[in-house]
Structure formats: C-alpha cells, structure tokens
C-alpha cells in the first residue's frame, strides 16, 4: 500500500496569538522547530521530539503539529499499531493508530486538539484507512484539568469525534479492565468490506460476543 501524504494547514486564533495547525510534517521540518518543554505526557520532551521525528520518517507515519511561532505546542501521531498489541495481529496495512495527542496546558481549551484531528482528516489518503485509538484512563492528565475520569472521558470522546472517530465495542482485556477505557475508530469511505470484517475479528477474540 502506498501512503501518500498531502500537507494541509489551518490557522487558529487564540487569546495568546495565532497557532498554525499543519501536517503531515517531514522529519527535517520537525527537527528545525523548537519542541515545548511541557510536552511530557509520554516521555521527557527532548525524547518525545526525537520519537516524533522518527515516526514522521516511517512510510505510514504522520505527525500533525500545532505551532506557535517556531515552537511546537501540540501534536498528534498516526502510525502502525505496536507489534505487541492485538491491533497489529491481522497485519492490516490499512489500519493505523492515532497513538498520541498532546497540547501544552497554556493552549488547552482553545480547540487545538479538535483542530489537530480535523486537519489530519483533510488528507484524502485518510479515507483509505481504518484509524483506531485506544483510550486508557491511566494515561490521562486528570491533575492538569480538575476533571474526574468520566468528565475527562467525555472530553476525549468529543475531541475524537471532531476527527470522525466514534466508540467501538471490543473484548480487549486492557480496554475491558475499566469502564472508562475505550476503543474509538474511524473507517474511511474507501475501506473494503473485507477489511471491516478483519477489523471486527480483531475487536472480538471471543466469537460469542461478535
């Protein structure tokens, strides 16, 4: 499968100034920009910057960024699922994972996350993919928002909905381990029925639930 990447951008006005939401960004461009030191949800900011540069260089890898002047203040990643996860078991070349989305506290509440997702989906290539994301409550920055688990889950769902991702049932043990965890997905308009059925088999290993 060829992974065409078509650049799109949208300017977002916030009280702190104009933020450019753009991508997919090349590894070279990513390396040129400053990476905000508060982008630490997954690993120290410098390490995360390096990880994004690496993802951007993968054939299927996509990084969409939120940029304030020359500094990255938010991003979303799309990449093949981790080989250790069940979502990679089918070796589906048209299934990619929204692996991480992060926005620094100063720019939260300005629709940056929603716009990152909306700009991601402007590329016609996204209609060829099943895009999944797995939400685990233990990854959520509850402290930074003063929200409880359910309020945060609702916020995450609304944000994912902005990119066309909706809730899907699954018997995955990690997701099933807490009712706030969930699988969300967006099935592109050009995805075949065969691929949808393969995705259904990945979602349910216990066939009686399927």
Curated annotation (Swiss-Prot):
The UniProt record lists the EC number as: 2.3.1.-
Does Transferase count among this protein's keywords? yes
Q: Which residues form the N-acetyltransferase domain?
A: 19-189
Which GO MF terms does the UniProt record name? acetoin dehydrogenase (NAD+) activity; acetyl-CoA synthetase acetyltransferase activity
Named in its record, the pathway it takes part in is: Ketone degradation; acetoin degradation
Q: Which SUPFAM superfamilies match?
A: Acyl-CoA N-acyltransferases (Nat) (SSF55729)
Specify the inducers. Answer: Induced by glucose starvation conditions.
Q: Which residues form a coiled coil?
A: none
Please state the span of the N-terminal signal peptide per the UniProt entry: none
A Pfam family (short name) is: Acetyltransf_1
Q: Which InterPro entries does this chain map to?
A: AcuA (IPR024699), Acyl_CoA_acyltransferase (IPR016181), GNAT_dom (IPR000182)
Tagged with keyword Transferase: yes
Which keywords fit this entry according to its UniProt record?
Acetoin catabolism, Acyltransferase, Transferase
The superkingdom of the source organism is Bacteria
Q: Which GO terms describe its biological process?
A: acetoin catabolic process; butanediol catabolic process; cellular response to glucose starvation; cellular response to nutrient levels
State what the entry records as the consequence of deleting this gene: No visible phenotype on growth in medium containing glucose and acetoin or in medium with acetate compared to wild-type. After glucose exhaustion acetoin is quickly consumed similarly to wild-type. In the late exponential growth phase slightly more pyruvate is produced compared to wild-type.
Query: What is the recorded function of this protein according to its Swiss-Prot or TrEMBL entry?
Result: Part of the acuABC operon, which is possibly involved in the breakdown of acetoin and butanediol. Acts as an acetyltransferase inactivating acetyl-CoA synthetase AcsA via acetylation at a Lys residue.
> Can you tell me which family this protein belongs to?
Belongs to the acetyltransferase family.
Assembly and interaction partners? Monomer.
For this entry, the protein name equals Acetoin utilization protein AcuA
């Amino acid at each position: 499968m060829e992974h065409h990447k078509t650049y799109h951008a949208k300017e977002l006005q916030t009280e702190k100034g104009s933020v450019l939401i753009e991508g997919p960004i090349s590894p070279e461009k990513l390396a040129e920009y400053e990476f905000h030191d508060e982008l630490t949800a997954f690993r120290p900011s410098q390490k995360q910057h390096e990880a994004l540069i690496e993802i951007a260089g993968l054939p299927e890898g996509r990084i969409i960024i939120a940029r304030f002047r020359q500094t990255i203040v938010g991003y979303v990643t799309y990449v093949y699922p981790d080989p250790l996860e069940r979502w990679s078991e089918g070796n589906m070349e048209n299934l990619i994972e929204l692996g991480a989305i992060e926005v620094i506290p100063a720019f939260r509440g300005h629709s940056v996350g929603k716009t990152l997702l909306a700009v991601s989906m402007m590329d016609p290539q996204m209609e060829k993919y099943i895009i999944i994301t797995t939400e685990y409550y233990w990854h959520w920055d509850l402290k930074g928002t003063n929200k409880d688990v359910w309020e945060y889950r609702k916020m995450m769902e609304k944000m994912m909905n902005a990119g066309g991702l909706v809730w899907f049932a699954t018997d995955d043990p990690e997701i099933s381990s807490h009712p706030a965890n969930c699988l969300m997905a967006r099935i592109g308009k050009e995805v075949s029925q065969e691929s949808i059925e393969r995705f259904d088999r990945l979602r349910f290993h216990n066939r009686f639930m399927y």
